[in-house]
Curated annotation (Swiss-Prot):
Residue span of motif EAR-like (transcriptional repression): 58-62
Stretches the record annotates as Disordered: 1-48, 71-98
Induction: Not induced by auxin.
Species: Oryza sativa subsp. japonica
Highest rank taxon of the organism: Eukaryota
Name of the featured protein: Auxin-responsive protein IAA8
Length: 205
């Protein structure tokens, strides 16, 4: 009996109390308390990260919009492509497209004058402007196809020296200036020749 009593007395008080009450040791409740505290600190960090991402997206959106809207009509067209296209259109030629060109120089030769001269045809006002400019350049009386028949009759009764305007087309044929519309003339003319009205070469055109 004394041995049993001493054995019961030697048992720790805490063990008997835990076994009777059914409560968990205090050491097991400490870890969940720490995890709860640590999890409670995470939401502020997540919110700050979200705000940083939103501000970054806003900055990227503003940058992209400023780059894309260079051309209001076509946002996908770069400025360099627009500039290249504009320059190409200004210098373009082709049938009936002389209005896009900046100049159209041709050589002009006059009978009896050894040196030819260059003339820009685009600024001129049709055949009338062309003949007026040539008459001023070469100090000569020049007519063209529309007046040629009337002049041929009058020319037989006068001693004045007149000249007619002819041109060479892209195929190498010599024609009387004025036999085709002005726009078609600009697309086909290669060079001009001012011939005497009584020249056999003139009447062969």
């Amino acid at each position: 009996m004394e041995c049993m009593a001493s054995t019961e007395e030697s048992l720790p008080a805490s063990s008997s109390m835990d076994s009777c009450s059914g409560e968990l040791p205090t050491t097991t409740t400490t870890a969940p308390a720490q995890s709860t505290a640590s999890s409670g600190c995470r939401p502020p960090a997540t919110a700050a990260k979200r705000r940083s991402l939103i501000s970054t997206d806003l900055r990227l959106g503003l940058t992209l919009s400023s780059v894309v809207h260079i051309d209001g009509n076509n946002p996908s067209t770069p400025r360099s492509s627009l500039t290249t296209a504009t320059v190409t259109a200004d210098r373009g030629g082709g049938g009936g497209g002389h209005g896009r060109r900046r100049s159209l120089f041709v050589k002009v030769y006059m009978e009896g004058v050894p040196i030819g001269r260059k003339l820009d045809l685009l600024p001129l006002d049709g055949y009338k402007g062309l003949v007026a400019r040539l008459a001023s350049m070469f100090r000569a009386s020049i007519t063209y196809h529309h007046c040629h028949r009337q002049f041929a009759v009058v020319g037989m009764k006068t001693n004045k020296v007149h000249h007619v305007l002819t041109y060479e087309d892209q195929e190498g044929d010599w024609m009387m200036a004025g036999d085709v519309p002005w726009e078609l003339f600009l697309t086909s003319v290669k060079r001009l020749r001012i011939a005497r009205a009584d020249d056999k070469y003139c009447y062969s055109c």
